[in-house]
Amino acid sequence: MTKRTFGGTSRKRKRVSGFRVRMRSHTGRRVIKSRRKRGRERIAV
């Protein structure tokens, strides 16, 4: 039986698209702002 190779790494996901990373840059802040405006339940990962 072969292993499932795609698991998704939570640490990497946070480092790439977490809230704190988004707040670092101007465009990231824009992402947060637009998601808040749209009423997303999850603003960042």
Swiss-Prot record:
Endpoints of the signal sequence: none
MF-aspect GO terms: structural constituent of ribosome
PROSITE patterns according to UniProt: RIBOSOMAL_L34
Ribonucleoprotein found in the keyword field: yes
Entry keyword Isomerase: no
Disordered: annotated segments: 1-45
A GO BP annotation: translation
The entry's keywords: Ribonucleoprotein, Ribosomal protein
Family: Belongs to the bacterial ribosomal protein bL34 family.
NCBIfam families, sorted: rpmH_bact (TIGR01030)
Annotated protein name in UniProt: Large ribosomal subunit protein bL34
Organism name: Prochlorococcus marinus subsp. pastoris (strain CCMP1986 / NIES-2087 / MED4)
